[in-house]
């Protein structure tokens, strides 16, 4: 049996401040109160929901046997992951979103699935994040992390943008396209998939680069070593500023002539699942794959 948990930290985003999320949060509080668990909420949760539980400062998280319980969709868990890796605290999700690739537990299964997890009966995965930096010769302008993907986009530019991709200081190619998606295996079922990228098992140590509407028909998704260091050199021929976003959340300007460095973050997300979780079951149900021969 694995680590049992002594404290639960409830996390929900303001973006998800609706009746369904509120109902699940209160149901969690009622259930956790019967489990000999100290109950706290994150500051983001307290700003949007009226729970009668104390706020645990983020610098205090991870000091005991803590578990972050996310209520919402995959976007909420992506947001929580950037906090969780800094305090080495595991995360599990209650799905109140749409697809729910990362949030395993259905609202009606809170008691039956979360109870065993609290008592040390769960599967734990480590998922890596990408660390991103925008810089030039003089300054560093932005640093951010992404569990799913880092996306270079056109911003306000109406034409194809131009940039060079280097991997481990070796030129890969010059691109003219709408942008580039750099995805982890976790993010391979998100934006990268819609752009034609491959589905990668989450335990692969790999990164996929997916060009967006490239001008070249030979420009295809490229799967590379997860330990590689990637640099995007933004061409000075671009007429306006471009944008870099991390998980579609943190978006920053990147100017012509600047560089974007992307590599694996040294810290990993500890993502928990109930014991009956299976990755291929999730793929089949979320993507609508057939479960048996129909002949």
Curated annotation (Swiss-Prot):
Transmembrane segments: none
Coiled-coil ranges per UniProt: none
GO cellular component: cytoplasm
One Pfam family here: NAD_kinase
Intracellular or extracellular location(s): Cytoplasm
Record-annotated disulphide pairs: none
Keyword annotations of the record: ATP-binding, Cytoplasm, Kinase, NAD, NADP, Nucleotide-binding, Transferase
EC number(s) recorded for this UniProt protein: 2.7.1.23
Gene Ontology molecular function: ATP binding; metal ion binding; NAD binding; NAD+ kinase activity
SUPFAM superfamilies, sorted: NAD kinase/diacylglycerol kinase-like
Binding site for NAD(+): 74-75, 148-149, 159, 176, 178, 189-194
InterPro entries per record: ATP-NAD_kinase_N, ATP-NAD_kinase_PpnK-typ_C, NAD/diacylglycerol_kinase_sf, NADK
Active site: 74
Enzyme superclass (EC): transferase
Catalytic activity: NAD(+) + ATP = ADP + NADP(+) + H(+)
Needed cofactors: a divalent metal cation
Gene Ontology biological process: NAD metabolic process; NADP biosynthetic process
UniProt similarity note: Belongs to the NAD kinase family.
Role noted for this protein: Involved in the regulation of the intracellular balance of NAD and NADP, and is a key enzyme in the biosynthesis of NADP. Catalyzes specifically the phosphorylation on 2'-hydroxyl of the adenosine moiety of NAD to yield NADP.
Designated name of the protein: NAD kinase
């Amino acid at each position: 049996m694995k680590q049992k948990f002594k404290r639960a930290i409830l996390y929900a985003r303001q973006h998800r401040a609706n009746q369904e999320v509120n109902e699940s949060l209160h149901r969690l509080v009622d259930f956790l109160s019967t489990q000999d668990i100290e109950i706290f909420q994150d500051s983001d949760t307290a700003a949007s929901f009226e729970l009668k539980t104390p706020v645990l400062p983020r610098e205090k998280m991870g000091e005991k046997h803590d578990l972050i319980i996310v209520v919402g969709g995959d976007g909420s868990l992506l947001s929580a992951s950037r906090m969780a890796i800094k305090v080495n605290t595991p995360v599990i999700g209650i799905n109140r979103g749409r697809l729910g690739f990362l949030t395993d537990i259905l609202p009606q299964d809170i008691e039956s699935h979360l109870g065993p997890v609290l008592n040390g009966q769960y599967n734990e995965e480590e998922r890596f994040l990408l660390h991103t930096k925008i810089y030039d010769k003089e300054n560093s302008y932005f640093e951010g992390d992404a569990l799913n993907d880092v996306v270079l986009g056109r911003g306000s530019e109406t034409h194809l943008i131009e940039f060079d991709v280097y991997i481990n200081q070796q030129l890969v190619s010059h691109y003219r396209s709408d942008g580039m998606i750099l995805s982890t295996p976790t993010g391979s079922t998100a934006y990268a998939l819609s752009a034609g990228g491959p589905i990668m098992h989450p335990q692969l140590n790999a990164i996929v680069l997916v060009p967006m509407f490239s001008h070249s028909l030979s420009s295809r998704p490229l799967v590379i070593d997860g330990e590689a260091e990637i640099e995007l050199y933004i061409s000075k021929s671009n007429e306006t500023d471009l944008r870099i976003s991390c998980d579609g959340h943190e978006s920053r300007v990147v100017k012509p002539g600047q560089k974007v460095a992307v590599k694996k973050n040294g810290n990993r997300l500890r993502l928990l699942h109930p014991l009956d979780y299976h990755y291929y079951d999730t793929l089949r149900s979320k993507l609508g794959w057939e479960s048996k021969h129909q002949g």
